[in-house]
Regions:
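Conserved "HGTGT" condensation-loop signature of ketosynthase/thiolase-family condensing enzymes
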Residues: 1-60, 80-81
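Active-site-adjacent elements of ketosynthase-type condensing enzymes
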Residues: 6-12, 66-76, 121-124
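Conserved catalytic cysteine-centered active-site region
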Residues: 18-20, 24-36, 64-116
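Short flexible/disordered coil segments
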Residues: 47-51, 90-94, 117-124
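A short, small-residue-rich loop immediately preceding and capping a beta-strand
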Residues: 57-61, 87, 115-123
Length: 124
């Protein structure tokens, strides 16, 4: 969906959106939803990081478009990937959600609440 497409249904313009957000177009996932996309991302993250689901201590999903309010999306990801020891919660902060989720995870790690997989492996 382009900015031009949006300007046909709401009072805006490509220039207005682009200058304020840098966004030119969006994708629509017709067969997917927030939960299925988050589960896929979780599985890919495990594979790319080379860790098991049992090693995961926390799952933070940043979204303002959950499929359900209960159970939250993070808990659905937790179950689907088998991260039975993880704390799981959603964080809703609209466009800045990713930054808030990342800084929350960083604070947990820095504070010693959770560890990076590499840190845990070095302690064994």
């Amino acid at each position: 969906v382009t900015n031009e497409d949006l300007s046909k249904i709401v009072e805006t313009s490509d220039e207005w959106i682009s200058s304020r957000s840098g966004i030119k177009e969006r994708r629509v996932a017709k067969e997917e939803n927030t939960t299925s996309l988050a589960i896929l991302a979780g599985k890919r993250a495990l594979e790319n990081a080379g860790v098991t689901a049992e090693e995961i201590e926390v799952i933070i999903v940043a979204t303002c478009t959950p499929d359900y309010f209960f159970p939250n999306t993070a808990c659905q990801v937790q179950e689907a990937i088998g991260a039975k020891h993880a704390v799981a919660f959603d964080l809703s902060a609209a466009c800045s959600g990713f930054l808030f989720a990342l800084s929350t995870a960083q604070a947990y790690i820095k504070g010693g609440i959770y560890q990076l997989s590499e840190q845990k492996r070095c302690q064994k």
